[in-house]
């Protein structure tokens, strides 16, 4: 079984091979991704930092998510995961960003986004600007 530390170390190795630095924008995880990554020796070579944007106002203030976008789609949605990743990259010197927004529970879910709904976003900086933005939705249980 792969542990969080194994995944974090492999992430660091892949980033090091490419000469990239990672930034995260986290909501429901409250900085857990950043904490896990920084436990790896040498993480300062490839980990830029983290924006912990638990509240809606933090998403706006820290990574520039539009209040109108939040009103239109809600905090747990594909457009917000995308905007968080793009905003983290735009507000840092990192090469790649990952965002996480979701409903950890035990309350707060609804029919469209039940507890356990998580959206991830990734954005990569290229010579022409922020490119290659991708998102993925997952539903976790327990």
Task: Please report, for each region that a protein language model flagged, where it lies by residue.
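Short alpha-helical segments enriched in small residues
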Residues: 1-142
């Amino acid at each position: 079984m792969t542990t969080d530390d194994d995944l974090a170390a492999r992430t660091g190795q892949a980033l090091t091979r490419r000469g990239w630095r990672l930034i995260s924008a986290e909501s429901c995880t409250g900085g857990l991704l950043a904490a896990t990554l920084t436990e790896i020796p040498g993480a300062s070579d490839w980990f830029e930092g983290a924006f912990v944007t638990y509240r809606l106002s933090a998403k706006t203030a820290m990574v520039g998510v539009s209040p109108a976008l939040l009103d239109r789609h809600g905090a747990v949605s594909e457009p917000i995961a995308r905007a968080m990743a793009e905003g983290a990259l735009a507000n840092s010197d990192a090469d790649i960003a990952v965002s996480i927004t979701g409903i950890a529970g035990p309350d707060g879910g609804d029919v469209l986004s039940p507890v356990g709904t998580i959206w991830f976003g990734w954005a990569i900086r290229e010579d022409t600007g922020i490119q290659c933005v991708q998102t993925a939705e997952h539903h976790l249980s327990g």
